[in-house]
From Swiss-Prot:
It comes from Yersinia pestis. Belongs to the 'phage' integrase family. XerC subfamily. Keywords: Cell cycle, Cell division, Chromosome partition, Cytoplasm, DNA integration, DNA recombination, DNA-binding. FtsK may regulate the catalytic switch between XerC and XerD in the heterotetrameric complex during the two steps of the recombination process. Site-specific tyrosine recombinase, which acts by catalyzing the cutting and rejoining of the recombining DNA molecules. Binds cooperatively to specific DNA consensus sequences that are separated from XerD binding sites by a short central region, forming the heterotetrameric XerC-XerD complex that recombines DNA substrates. The complex is essential to convert dimers of the bacterial chromosome into monomers to permit their segregation at cell division. It also contributes to the segregational stability of plasmids. In the complex XerC specifically exchanges the top DNA strands. Residues 113-292 form the Tyr recombinase domain. This is Tyrosine recombinase XerC.
Length: 303
């Protein structure tokens, strides 16, 4: 341990114990804090920072800029600065610092990541699979349910038979934060779910899971990802197929057709409308593409 880390580390360790014991944060979260603060201590040593008590706003900005030069992206920088702010707030509460020097420091904004989707024709191409065995029927049902209801992968694999009402076409799923919600499946998804359920007993089910592996146990998320990717290749779909892409496609196509952002929010199970609003950017991209292709005075680069 260097002279600098010997003076910086004890308070970091005390903060981590506080997070673990008093805040009762998960070991994974505490490990994340440790990783970020250890990296900051290393950079601080390079800057000649000997004590947290001497840290000022200029040095905080230097910590951020050096982290950026080390290759951290904006989202990772924001995470690192957030960990530092929390630590410094704790130092303020302990009387070590009079104020938090990171309070007014911001990180570079990250570009908004737009989820990729596939168009309706590509979806239809993907779903027109050759039903030559029970597993193919199962996969078709999973694809139809994923696209028909816009489910998360965890929600799909977590579906149980008791959660589905085929008569009404509804299913109860367990979303993020263990929040249940009821979503409509749509007629096509219900039809293919019925086809699969008629074959499900062939796999000698070991629990109430709707979708089973060939062992009779609940299918794993990894298996679903693998099967979807394989079907994308077999069907000649132009982009890599993964479950989240079908969820994004569901959201985009619903918004393009209805324009009802609140309804899409409810269907996706988003706690905040802000999360759903990213699809308005996708919808605008769609409109802009149509405009550029159709409007007589929208020819770019021409006068």
């Amino acid at each position: 341990m260097t002279e600098f880390s010997a003076s910086l580390a004890p308070q970091v360790e005390a903060f981590l114990r506080y997070l673990s014991i008093e805040r009762q944060l998960s070991p994974l979260t505490v490990t994340s804090y440790r990783r970020q603060l250890s990296a900051l201590m290393e950079i601080g040593e390079q800057m000649g920072l000997a004590h947290w008590q001497t840290l000022d706003a200029a040095q905080v900005r230097s910590l951020v800029s050096r982290s950026k030069r080390a290759g951290l992206h904006a989202s990772s920088l924001a995470l690192r600065l957030s960990a530092l702010r929390s630590f410094l707030n704790w130092l303020v509460s302990q009387g070590v610092l009079p104020a938090n020097p990171a309070k007014g420091v911001s990180t570079p904004r990250s570009g908004r990541h737009l989820p990729k989707n596939i168009d309706v024709d590509e979806v239809n191409k993907l779903l027109s699979i050759d039903l030559n065995d029970p597993l193919a029927v199962r996969d078709r049902a999973m694809l139809e349910v994923m696209y028909g209801a816009g489910l998360r992968l965890s929600e799909l694999v977590g579906m149980n038979c008791k959660h589905v009402d085929l008569a009404s076409g509804d299913v109860w799923v367990m979303g993020k934060g263990s929040k249940e919600r009821k979503v409509p499946l749509g007629k096509t998804a219900v039809t293919w779910l019925q086809h699969w359920l008629a074959l499900r007993e062939l796999f000698e089910p070991q629990d109430d899971a709707i979708f089973l592996a060939n062992t009779g146990k609940r299918i794993s998320a990894r298996n679903v990802q693998k099967r979807f990717a394989e079907w994308g290749v077999k069907q000649g779909v132009s982009s890599h197929i993964h479950p989240h892409k079908l969820r994004h496609s569901f959201a985009t196509h619903m918004l393009e057709s209805s324009g009802d952002l609140r309804a899409v929010q409810e269907l996706l199970g988003h706690a905040n409308l802000t999360t759903t609003q990213i699809y308005t950017h996708l919808d605008f991209q769609h409109l802009a593409t149509v405009y550029d292709a159709a409007h007589p005075r929208a020819k770019r680069g021409k006068s």
